[in-house]
Amino acid sequence: MRLGVNFGYQDWGANLQGALAMAKEADSLGYSSGWTAEAYGTDAVTPLTWMLANTERMSFGPAIMQMPARTPAMTAMTAATLDLMSGGRFLLGQIGRAHV
């Protein structure tokens, strides 16, 4: 069984160090993945990039990315770049769309 941590959508300015401490602890305990979310205000990719840079084994990805906020090409380039830079630890999760 694989376990993951959902960091959700939060105020990263106020809680970045707490979330990073949780990510490091989960990494040391053998958790397999960490997930962030986004809404208008802060994005999902930037915090997980910080977590990828500060952990060793866990994979990280955005559980939800708002497609109206970025093009499919930019999403693919972001995913490919982070996957290369993290040694294959980037996960591309659910890609949501706005309600019509």
Describe these PLM feature segments.
Residues 1-61, 98-99:
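N-terminal beta1-alpha1-beta2 module of alpha/beta enzyme domains
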Residues 2-16, 69-99:
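Flexible, glycine-rich active-site loops centered on histidine and acidic residues
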Residues 41, 66-67:
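Positions that flank functional sites
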Residues 59-65, 91:
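A short, GP-enriched loop/loop-strand-helix hinge that lies immediately N-terminal to
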